[in-house]
Amino acid sequence: MDVPCLWYSLLILLLLFIFLLIHHCFTTSKTQNMFLPPSPRKLPIIGNLHQLGSHPHRSLRKLSQKYGPVMLLHLGSKPVIVASSVDAARDILKTHDHVWATRPKYSIADSLLYGSKDVGFSPFGEYWWQVRSIVVLHLLSNKRVQSYRDVREEETANMIEKIRQGCDASVINLGEHLCFLTNNITSRVALGRTYDERESGIDAKDILEQFLQLLDTFNVGDYIPWLKWVNKITGLDTKVEKIAKKLDTFLDSVIEEHIIRNKKEEYAITDEAKDFVDVLLEIQNGKETDFPLQRDSLKAILLDAFAAGTDTIYTNLDWTMADVLRQPRAMKTLQNEVRGLAQGKSEITEDDLKNMQYLRAVIKESLRLHPPNSLLVPRESMEDVKLLGYYHIPARTQALINVWAIGRDPLSWENPEEFCPERFLNNDIDMKGLKFELLPFGSGRRGCPGSSFAIAVIELALARLVHKFNFALPKGTKPEDLDMTECTGIATRRKSPLPVVATPFSG
């Protein structure tokens, strides 16, 4: 054996190993530290979960002011990118929308939405494309949204009359009226009618409220999988199962009611009068598409309507009325526009809304300051991607878009903390996510398909309220004293009631 040769070979192998080790450490360190976004220090096991606080959108904005508009957090074992700037949001929602098109898995959504068979939480793929197409083309197309006009006008008229009847009282809770309005409109459009507990024996409003609360409940098992057993001890699993069964029973009864009604020979319904259940049953029977829509999928789509519709619309109406009550000058300008364009009409219709520029500016400004979804529902990257052309983001990283922070970014808005509807006059920023300074309904593939419907309800309700009534705060309450404390959930609501004195306008 040639010993020197052996040692020489071993030395070469050793040097090669050392070189490869150094190269690996260098490139790994470079990837992990140079090209990943900056990140706050994390704790063992929980990562950065402790830094979210009770109002995550506010906590994340504060962190972004230190670490930058793109930062990396670790929520338990899950890497999460937080985007707090227009450029970062555009890169995720437009430039690389195809990469960020799927959703992380959430076990509560899975349990309540029949294995996430809805549009909102369904993972990206053929199934999601099919159900989203059904919603966009058959439930919320421009033609279909217009067909719900009578429902919107009837229910807003009912709300106006109830407020008028309550004017004898010194103070009314306007928020309660707005909540009933959105519940009734959503119920009639989706299910065909409102459901009274005394009539059906089921408190649909309470069940749906619990559904929304559970959908937003923090589930430790989603972030620290080996701790999912905690949900059994806390009773969360049992509560989710209980509400899921109640929802299923209620929705089955609604569907069966439609099936029995539609079989009656004397029953005839125009296409314009069909509700979501009618349309979905036709699709299930193969009359509109070849896609095999199962009943569980049908029910999941209906639940989406309530999760995205009721909460979002009510939340924006409540914030908008609170904003103009705090700004009497804006309220007066809004009333002058609406009453002037109404031209003495006793009732405003949707035909009158098209020229109400200040009305739309007020709604946009309220959505900027108080987006119903302060943080867009997280997305997840399906492959490695570069963010802003620099940061390396591995596959299966979640992305949170802080819409609330973007709406208050001084780089995009002058005096961002002030309520100033005039900033939206004569500019091209819309509410549908085409401009990334304002993202109340998201953008891209995962943008809310119901934005047109929501805007139609909000515009009509707001116009009719300020047309019919003069509003004031209770005696002794200054505009600046109105409680604007937030309550986070599926939507970021105002926490307190909205007490007002409403006086019918007789002009």
From Swiss-Prot:
- Which parts of the chain span the membrane according to its record? 3-23
Q: What UniProt keywords apply to this chain's record, in alphabetical order? A: Heme, Iron, Membrane, Metal-binding, Monooxygenase, Oxidoreductase, Transmembrane, Transmembrane helix
Q: Which InterPro entries does the record match to this protein?
A: Cyt_P450, Cyt_P450_CS, Cyt_P450_E_grp-I, Cyt_P450_sf
One Gene Ontology cellular component term attached to this UniProt record is:
membrane
Molecular-function GO terms, alphabetical:
heme binding; iron ion binding; monooxygenase activity; oxidoreductase activity, acting on paired donors, with incorporation or reduction of molecular oxygen
Name the species this protein comes from.
Solanum melongena
* Membrane topology of the entry: Single-pass membrane protein
EC numbers, comma separated:
1.14.-.-
Kindly provide the name given to this protein in its UniProt entry: Cytochrome P450 71A4
**KW Coiled coil (keyword) present:** no
Which cofactors, if any, are listed as required? heme
Record's PROSITE patterns?
Answer: CYTOCHROME_P450
The record's family statement is: Belongs to the cytochrome P450 family.
Taxonomic superkingdom: Eukaryota
Q: Where along the chain is heme bound?
A: C448
Localization, per the record, is: Membrane
Could you tell me what this protein does? May have a role in maturation, such as during flavor formation or other metabolite production specific to aging tissues.
- Main location class: membrane
